[in-house]
From Swiss-Prot:
It comes from Leptothrix cholodnii (strain ATCC 51168 / LMG 8142 / SP-6). Its main location: membrane. It is a peripheral membrane protein. Gene3D superfamilies: NADH:ubiquinone oxidoreductase, 30kDa subunit. GO terms for cellular component: plasma membrane. This is NADH-quinone oxidoreductase subunit C. SUPFAM superfamilies: Nqo5-like.
């Protein structure tokens, strides 16, 4: 495994070169971080270069780093993380890109390179609000079309903004503001010598 990772790391360093922001090797996996401006071009290189040959995209997910390291993280907030597979070389790579603008997270779409990125990018858009430039059908995939916000963002309230219910007078489903009141629950601790027959 180590020799295979050495070979892959050397190939990435040789082919991608100075466009690498970070190349981290941890727990038997490589993570390549690139600039948003180079993201699509590097994706195409990773797929087409014979020494790399990542012909399959397995997954794309969004990440919100706003609370990372207990708030000690000071980098960009949103990232798109792609997981790539090379069947011909039998190796994997994690490709990470940070959106340069936290207020409007925008990165290039990988759908022209790997068509399987379509629904994964839609999910990252729906859950995190990351916009994939060049995606031909970027719309919500898991939440309602009228949903407000992006539920996997760390600043999204756990209760949400609105709730859905059936209104018998209107004979249809309606949205209304959330009626749940925030409360603090303090757990009750029972300290008995013979609790649960453990002694």
């Amino acid at each position: 495994m180590t020799q295979k990772l050495d070979t892959l790391q050397a190939a990435i360093e040789r082919v991608i070169g100075d466009r690498i922001v970070h190349l981290v090797r941890d727990r038997g996996e490589l993570t390549l971080t690139v600039k948003a401006t180079d993201y699509a071009a590097i994706g195409k290189t990773l797929r087409d270069h014979p020494d790399l040959g990542f012909e399959q995209l397995i997954d794309i997910c969004g990440v919100d780093y706003s609370g990372y390291k207990d708030g000690g993280y000071e980098g960009l907030r949103y990232a798109a993380v792609s997981h790539l597979l090379s069947v011909q070389h039998n190796w994997r790579l994690r490709l990470k890109v940070f959106a340069p603008d936290d207020d409007f997270p925008l990165v290039a779409s990988l759908t022209p390179i790997w068509s399987g990125a379509n629904w994964f990018e839609r999910e990252a858009f729906d859950m995190y609000g990351i916009v994939f430039d060049g995606h031909t059908d970027l719309r919500r995939i898991l939440t309602d079309y009228g949903f407000i916000g992006h539920p996997m963002r760390k600043d999204f309230p756990v209760t949400g903004h609105v709730e859905m219910r059936y209104d018998p007078e209107q004979k249809r489903v309606i949205y209304q503001p959330v009626s749940i009141e925030p409360r603090e629950i303090t757990p009750r601790i029972i300290r008995e010598d013979n609790y649960g027959g453990l002694h």
